[in-house]
From Swiss-Prot:
Miscellaneous section: Present with 907 molecules/cell in log phase SD medium.
Compartmental location: Nucleus, Nucleolus; Peroxisome
Gene: RPC10
Source organism (scientific name): Saccharomyces cerevisiae (strain ATCC 204508 / S288c) (Baker's yeast)
Annotated binding of Zn(2+), by residue: C31, C34, C48, C51
A family per Pfam: Zn_ribbon_RPAB4
Role summary: DNA-dependent RNA polymerases catalyze the transcription of DNA into RNA using the four ribonucleoside triphosphates as substrates. Common component of RNA polymerases I, II and III which synthesize ribosomal RNA precursors, mRNA precursors and many functional non-coding RNAs, and a small RNAs, such as 5S rRNA and tRNAs, respectively. RNA polymerases are composed of mobile elements that move relative to each other. In Pol II, the core element with the central large cleft comprises RPB3, RBP10, RPB11, RPB12 and regions of RPB1 and RPB2 forming the active center.
Zinc finger (C4-type): 31-51
Name by which UniProt lists this protein: DNA-directed RNA polymerases I, II, and III subunit RPABC4
Subunit composition and interactions: Component of the RNA polymerase I (Pol I), RNA polymerase II (Pol II) and RNA polymerase III (Pol III) complexes. Component of the RNA polymerase I (Pol I) complex consisting of 14 subunits: RPA135, RPA190, RPC40, RPA14, RPB5, RPO26, RPA43, RPB8, RPA12, RPB10, RPC19, RPC10, RPA49 and RPA34. The complex is composed of a horseshoe-shaped core containing ten subunits (RPA135, RPA190, RPB5, RPO26, RPB8, RPB10, RPC10, RPA12, RPC19 and RPC40) where RPA135 and RPA190 form the DNA-binding cleft.
Gene Ontology, cellular component aspect: cytoplasm; nucleolus; nucleoplasm; nucleus; peroxisome; RNA polymerase I complex; RNA polymerase II, core complex; RNA polymerase III complex
Length: 70
């Protein structure tokens, strides 16, 4: 695309709104030391909020997981 073909976007409010709404997806973990359940987002430190232990296990899903045997 050449420079002459580039047009400045006119709807900057919609573009700015998309970047400011970051998804705050949190994952559920279980502490390996004290077995407390906690949720961590992407920017949180990987550390238990109760005891400070650094080993966290990912919690199992509530959905039915079924595999076919051969």
């Amino acid at each position: 695309m050449s420079r002459e073909g580039f047009q400045i976007p006119t709807n900057l409010d919609a573009a700015a709104a998309g970047t400011s709404q970051a998804r705050t997806a949190t994952l559920k973990y279980i502490c390996a030391e004290c077995s407390s359940k906690l949720s961590l987002s992407r920017t949180d430190a990987v550390r238990c909020k109760d005891c400070g232990h650094r080993i966290l296990l990912k919690a199992r899903t509530k959905r039915l997981v079924q595999f076919e045997a051969r």
